[in-house]
């Protein structure tokens, strides 16, 4: 298994805090959130790729000196208006023939990822994590799923009318066969900015299992804004 962490966004909603500093390096629990993510997964994967934009490539290069297992991919963008979108950024890092754990770089987990990875190893399909949220406003800002026998039966990114209280944060595991479908997703006309658009497209074409999170996921913007 390999890992991709997406850190190429510009976090304009958090300006001026993130105008000249990457959101992924904001500190939670005494260290950058990106450090938490790398440390939670590195013993389970053979390779970790962080996709960054060109504007923050240098500062992330400095950060990565403490993590020799991490390689950076520069998507060459320099501003929010020129961003490629999460799915295109993901395609820059995905290599054929490997399964991947894929994460956004702006969510903090208060539990280790080993249980999620072990679940994937048991079911041998692509997987998402979920937790329960009762607040309809929060549900409209995330991905929401329905589940039957632990299999995803519906998946909607940022639904106007949420079909359940099962919210999916941006942590996914994709099989090698499903990773090979990423180019089809990109050409399908889906919203390239939403990392969850891949799973949303995929769930009706491939089996995706849902893993109930054993802890909490916190969007870093909720801590700083």
Name these PLM-found stretches.
Residues 111-139:
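Conserved donor-nucleotide/metal-binding helix-loop-beta segment in metal-dependent transferases, i.e.
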Residues 117-121, 151-225:
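Catalytic-core segments of class I nucleotidyltransferases/pyrophosphorylases
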Residues 100, 108, 144, 170-171, ...:
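A residue-level structural signature of the nucleotidyltransferase/glycosyltransferase Rossmann-like core
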Residues 19-23:
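Short alpha-helical oligomerization interface
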Residues 25, 144-147, 210:
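A structural signal for short hydrophobic beta-strand segments in well-ordered beta-sheet cores
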